[in-house]
Structures are given as structure tokens and as C-alpha cells.
Amino acid sequence: MEEKMLPVPNEGHRRRRFHWGSIATVILVVAVCVYAFTLFGDKESPENTQTANDDTDWNLVLVNYENAIPENYESKLVEVPGGEKVDERIYDPLMEMLEAAKEGNWDQLPMVVSGYRTQKKQQQLYDDKVAGYRKEGNSQSEAEELAKQWVSVPGYGEHQIGLAVDINGATYDLYFWLQENSYKYGFIFRYPGDKTDITGVAEEVWHYRYVGVEAATEMYEKGLCLEEYLAERQAVRH
């Protein structure tokens, strides 16, 4: 299928923490496969381990290149339009957000092009990405490091807990709308370009994570990523 690019936004559309120059060539209308290759991880065992019984709100569990999915973590899944699945606890706010987002998407319902992923699926995506970089002439270690910028190592990705979605639309305006309104529904723009040194992930304007309205609102108002929010929250508790 021929790939079709979305229209490039003009300067008047720019928003804070939004760096379109670096991603204008990556956001595709129908290239679902690109959006599948979206998370960053680390193959090495993390220093901080979690279990499903830790005193952490389910919606604020941290999964990234340093923090593996909690042991015995389980998600009850439900299907969304398009066939992808998410944790049933985020279904209602997700659908409310997508319905409202039609105003920024030419009155079309945005699509979830990647939701929950199994361990097998995540492994396949990671291996395929590594293989792609190997074909470009990179060594195995180089290919793995490059792959981690876009695909999380199995066991270290938010898609495997069912709380993250990759959203595709008909226009770039959708992503502007999501950045400015997703918090109202409990979702956060998970990987902004100016937080890469903290999240370890390149800017992904399509990737949204559910954290709850209260947390999402505070993160939006303070300009925090999830790692910063949780660190601040922990400091207050102590």
C-alpha cells in the first residue's frame, strides 16, 4: 500500500513541548506498522523491581527502560474499534477522548493502531527492528541500542500492561488537540521531545498513557513527564 503523508502544520500551530521538525516525516496516516514500533526499553535487569502487590496505584505503575512490568501483573482486556485491546479500566475515558478528538481530526474518529501487546508480539517487534538496523550495516550491539530508541525490550514496555495506546488520525491537528486536551480524560502525552533525557524515548506524538485525571492534570499544568511526577510524589511522601 502506498504510504500517504499528513499535511505539514504551519508555524501558527506550534505548542509548548511539541517539536514537529523532528517527526514530520514519521507520522503516517495509514502506516500502522510504524506506530507499532514505538517504545524504548533496556535489555539489562533493572535496579528497581516491582511486584503487583506494591503500594502503587494501578494507573501510575511505572514501566520504562529501568523498570520492568511488575511480577504477576495482569490486565483484563476489552476490544476497542479497530480490533486493538486495552485494559478495561481505561476503555470509557479512552472512547470519550477519541470521540471528543474528532473536532481536531476532520470530524473523524481517531483510531487506536496499537494497544495491548503480548510478550511474543513485543519480542517480534524488537527482533524485527534489530534485524532492520543490522541490514543497514550496524553491529549487533549497535543495532540493539538503535532499536531501543523506538521499540521497548520485552517486559519493559507500557503496551504490555494495557494502559498505553498509539493513536492515528487524518491530520496533524489531531496531535495538537491531544496534547492540549488529553489530560481532561486522564491521558498524558507520554514522550515529549524535551523529556527524552529522562524517559529515554524519542518523541512519540502518537503515544498516550492513562494515569487518571488528577495525575494527568497535574503533569500537564506543571509540564512533568511520568518519571518526574512520580519522583516528586515520592519526595512529598518522605
Annotated model-derived regions:
Residues E2-H238:
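Extracytoplasmic cell-surface/polysaccharide-interacting catalytic and binding patches
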